[in-house]
Amino acid sequence: MSKNELLNVRIKNGTFYVSSKEDKGDGWVKQEFPNPQKKEETLVRYHKNVSIEGTVNHLAMNDDKYQGKVLNLIVGGEYQSYALSVPIMDTGGSVLTTNQYFNSLVGALENIKKGDKITMFVNSKNYDKKDRLYRNVVTLNSDGKLIKSNFSFSEVPKWKSSNTDNDFGETITKWDASPTNKFYIDKFKEVLASFKSENHKEESQDPEIKVKETPSIKSSSLQNSEPDLPF
């Protein structure tokens, strides 16, 4: 990989990875997916697992063609930078919820500032009672210590429920995660506002920062963010 290359990073079960339409050699593993737009067609991608370590450069909420609203975080490493996109909403289940990886990032981001050095990895060891990996991102500071949220799980609003009887006299419970969703989305908005405030302070203190940093991030993102299915 070339120096200062921007890697578009995604998350799958237990790891960060980058995706390519071409086999780039050592470490790249072939993956096959059904094309959601043409179900009779099989798409081929090559994945390579990566770790994220570097300096926090950029945080935003963006729109993705396939995933809707996403959290976008850019971390600058020594030889390459990492653009991590995480969908805010998880539409795969019967109840509309915020994405669990997103939730874990929001908690850590409360205590991360632009310029902080961090290390990030995806949980690959801890399982729930149903033997499923917990879907969370672990973030460490420059001293290797866990960056925790400012809130406890007991402070997160619970899902709402309502019961109705169907025509057979059976009681059906309908779940609504909107209180929980709003909590995490509001927290993310607060974090974004804090990052924007830091940017304004830097630019007012040193006008050169706007010229040196912002265009390089944006141009790199545009050059390396070819629209593709989220595989």
What are these regions (language model features)?
Residues M1-S85, G93, T97-E110, K125-N166, ...:
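OB-fold ssDNA-binding interfaces and closely related basic DNA-contact patches used
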Residues V191-K210:
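Intrinsically disordered, low-complexity mixed-charge segments
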Residues L6, D206-E208, T214:
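Low-complexity, intrinsically disordered short peptide segments enriched in small/polar/basic residues
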Residues K212-F231:
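Short acidic, low-complexity intrinsically disordered linear motifs used
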